[in-house]
Every structure is written in C-alpha cells, then in structure tokens.
Amino acid sequence: MMKLKAIWFAVLSAAVFFSGMPSRAENPVKASPDKFSLAVECVKRFEGWHGEKKHWPYVGWGHKVLPGERFTNGITKAQGDSILRADLRKLCRMFSYLGRDSLLAAVLSYNVGPYRLKGYGKRPKSRLLKKLESGDRNIYKEYVSFRCYKGKVVPSIERRRKVEFMLFFEE
C-alpha cells in the first residue's frame, strides 16, 4: 500500500512540475506557424523561381522533381508555394527528434539535401547533427560550414547560412 502511494505521488508531482515544459520533439509547424512561414519566405528569397527549362530538374522554388512526379517548368507560383511548404513539412518531420532545431535543420537540408546532414552509405553523419543530437548548442561554425560548392566558399551561400542561422536558431 505504501509503494502504491509513493508511485501515485511521483506521477502526480511529475504531472504538476513538468506539464508546462515543452516536449523535445515538439512540432515547429504547429508551435509557431509564423516561424514556418518565415522559413518559407527565406527559402523563396534565396532559391529564386525555377520556371525555365534550363533549371530542370528543379521547378518552383527549388523543388527537385523526383521519379514518378509529373511537374513541369510551367507550374504556377501558387503551386510552387504549396510544393515548397509540403517539402519543408516533410523535412521538419524528418528532423522532428531535434525539437526546436528541427526547422533550422529542415531549412538547411532543403538546400543541401537531407543526406548531407544525416549521412548515407559511405557519407558520414555531419558534425552539425552529431552536436545537436548530443545536446551541444554551439553550432554556428558547423552550420555556416555548409557554404562551399566544389570545395570553394561561395559568398552568397555564406550570407544565406548566416541569415538562416540568425532567423531560426533559438538559444
């Protein structure tokens, strides 16, 4: 009987003390739709519109057409916007275990690809993701390090990373 009372006390006290604490895998899309909309606008600003044949296989705001998808370069901006939102939601779900950093990882992986962060085959997991998973929040250097193309630093990509970090990293 005494053990039962102790268990009930522990459960009730946990419910009272931890009820206001957000869970680690909180959905950033539901928690702050304004941050998600800001992420959409940020991606639009830096990606630009891919509406010409020279941009193929990219359409809309940088969506890569996958096998089986029937998109053309003639899609409307509204269609491009909904495709972008769907892609970002999918990436947020992919990184949802990071909690408040899932939107930051989703915005980065929209540009560089999720497997540059997560690793795949012979490609190792990124230092950025390793740090976030271990709880280390000192990630500025690792985040901005995704600024190279063919081994060379691209100033516009570096600017993009700094803006994304400033907008979506929460202390």
Regions found by a protein language model. Give the residues of each.
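Bacterial N-terminal signal peptides that target proteins for export
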Residues: M1-W8
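Bacterial N-terminal signal peptides
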Residues: A10-F17
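Long, amphipathic alpha-helical surface segments
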Residues: F18-H50, H63-P67, I75-M94, Y115-E171
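Extracytoplasmic
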Residues: L38, K54-W56, R100
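Early exported N-terminus immediately downstream of N-terminal targeting peptides
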Residues: H55-V59, H63
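Structural motif
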Residues: F95-D101
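Short N-proximal segments of mature Sec-exported proteins
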Residues: S102-R116
